[in-house]
Design a protein with these regions (language model features):
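Active-site "cap" helix and flanking loop/linker of ATP-utilizing ligase/carboxylase catalytic domains
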Residues: 3-52
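Generic C-terminus detector
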Residues: 78-121
Length: 121
């Protein structure tokens, strides 16, 4: 897919690249030199936060942050509706860990945080 805007598939760059897709987009629009697109770690995982069937409660963000302080949470301020994309979470993989195991563990951690924000945990 070609998108002439920042795209969901690049949201990981907010926390996992030297220059995020949003900064790159602004640089391109303003005819400025592009920044480095190098990753800051071997991998970054991103999990979408979709509206769940139940309200996660007013303390969901605090519970999500307490569950895993290394996860970066990006919520969009949208009203909740089942299936609606409300945000995403990113987790940069530890560069010293075994890549395959670290990615699987990071994905599980990011999914657990997304479940809290969705109202499923």
């Amino acid at each position: 897919e070609l998108a002439m805007r920042p795209h969901n598939s690049g949201h990981w760059t907010q926390d996992g690249a030297v220059t995020s897709q949003f900064a790159q987009h602004m640089r391109a629009v303003l005819d400025l030199p592009l920044g480095s697109s190098e990753p800051t770690a071997p991998a970054t995982v991103m999990v979408n936060v979709l509206g769940g069937r139940s309200d996660p409660g007013e303390d969901a963000l605090a519970r999500a942050l307490a569950l895993d302080p290394q996860v970066r949470i990006h919520m969009y301020g949208k009203s909740r509706r089942p299936g609606r994309k409300l945000g995403h979470v990113n987790l940069v993989v530890d560069p010293t860990a075994d890549p395959a195991a670290a990615v699987a563990a990071a994905l599980a951690r990011a999914r657990a945080v997304a479940a809290v924000l969705r109202g499923d945990a």
